[in-house]
């Protein structure tokens, strides 16, 4: 990427969804730009090379100059005069990505870049959210992955950028309420995600990222200590079989790639988490959206877990269980696994 030119977004591409329903051409460029942001952000955090920092600052400037951080398919330009401030999955992710880079690279980013991040993230994410009366957004009281992704990213963004005080606590209290009351209640007591395994990983990862950030800020509030959270954490291992085959109910795929960073974090938290075969973990280039949370935690949480294993703090990774029958009464799923992890 160091020698590659960052592609430009255009009004023509953005308009295509309204004109002919095509969202993919715009998104291809949008996510390529997020590849630049995530790749140079992670490289800067790991290696601290001047050339990467300089390229990252250029990329941040480009991201902050975008007219709208939301995807074209998620805005309503004819109905909403403030459509450029739409907060969707990718807008909240972009805000959090920039906020975390601000926090982790404070001593290396220029004052100009840091001020740009604070200004744009506040203008596009934090201020609109704080001004709107809850539940102001369709995802704020949703029981699906949108709630966890948007609320989790906004919460983490506030932790990184807002000064401690009443304003920050009011926002975080609103986020905690939304996640507890709606997202977690979208799961039954059996912890199954009826949206499918892929959306389990997407939503739950973002919730856990916020939970860990919130716990670091205030150890007295710990979403990961909830009994239901632990039940949800075990869902992935119930859905994997031999050769990477997975349960394909709902929007799930018949073959999946799992988030290693999230799995390692859960193994650090709950001890009895089981790992699918590592060959089926999603690699650095496995996510077309270049989601910052997955890429950063894929490095950070995996590294932390391996260090904890080496130091005897936690047990070594456990493989999937052998032959067993798993009944998830709330989802009404019965899962049968053969002796060699084959689906029955």
Q: Where is each model-derived feature located?
A:
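Carbohydrate-active enzyme catalytic cores, enriched for enzymes
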Residues: 204-344
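Low-complexity, Ser/Thr/Pro/Gly-enriched N-terminal "stalk/linker" regions
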Residues: 1-18
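Low-complexity, intrinsically disordered regions enriched in charged/polar residues
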Residues: 7-11, 95, 115, 119, ...
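Exposed boundary/loop context
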Residues: 14, 184, 189-191, 291, ...
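Short, functionally important structural connectors and interaction interfaces within domains
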Residues: 6-9, 185, 320-323
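Aromatic-lined, polymer-binding surfaces characteristic
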Residues: 27-240, 246
């Amino acid at each position: 990427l160091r020698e590659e030119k960052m592609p430009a977004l255009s009004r023509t591409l953005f308009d295509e969804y309204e004109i002919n329903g095509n969202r993919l051409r715009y998104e291809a460029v949008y996510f390529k730009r997020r590849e630049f942001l995530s790749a140079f952000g992670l490289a800067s955090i790991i290696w601290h090379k001047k050339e990467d920092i300089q390229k990252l600052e250029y990329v941040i400037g480009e991201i902050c100059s975008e007219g709208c951080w939301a995807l074209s398919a998620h805005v309503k330009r004819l109905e909403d005069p403030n459509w450029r401030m739409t907060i969707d999955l990718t807008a909240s992710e972009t805000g959090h990505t920039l906020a975390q880079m601000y926090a982790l690279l404070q001593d290396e980013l220029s004052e100009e870049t840091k001020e740009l991040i604070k200004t744009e993230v506040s203008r596009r994410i934090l201020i609109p959210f704080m001004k709107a009366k809850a539940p102001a957004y369709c995802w704020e009281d949703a029981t699906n992955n949108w709630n966890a992704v948007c609320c989790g990213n906004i919460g983490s963004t506030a932790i990184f950028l807002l000064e401690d005080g009443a304003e920050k606590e009011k926002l975080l209290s609103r986020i905690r309420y939304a996640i507890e009351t709606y997202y977690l209640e979208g799961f039954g007591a059996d912890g199954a995600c009826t949206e499918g395994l892929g959306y389990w990983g997407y939503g739950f990862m973002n919730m856990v990222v916020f939970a860990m950030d919130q716990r670091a800020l205030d150890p007295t509030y710990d979403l990961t200590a909830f009994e239901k959270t632990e039940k949800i954490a075990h869902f992935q291992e119930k859905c994997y079989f031999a050769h990477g085959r997975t349960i394909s109910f709902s929007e799930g795929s018949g073959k999946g790639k799992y988030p290693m960073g999230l799995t390692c974090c859960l193994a650090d938290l709950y001890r009895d988490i089981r790992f699918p075969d590592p060959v089926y973990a999603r690699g650095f280039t496995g996510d077309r959206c270049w989601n910052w949370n997955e890429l950063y935690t894929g490095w950070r949480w995996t590294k932390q877990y391996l260090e904890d294993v080496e130091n005897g703090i936690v047990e070594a990774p456990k493989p999937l269980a052998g032959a067993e029958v798993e009944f998830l009464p709330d989802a009404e799923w019965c899962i049968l696994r053969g002796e060699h992890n084959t689906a029955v």
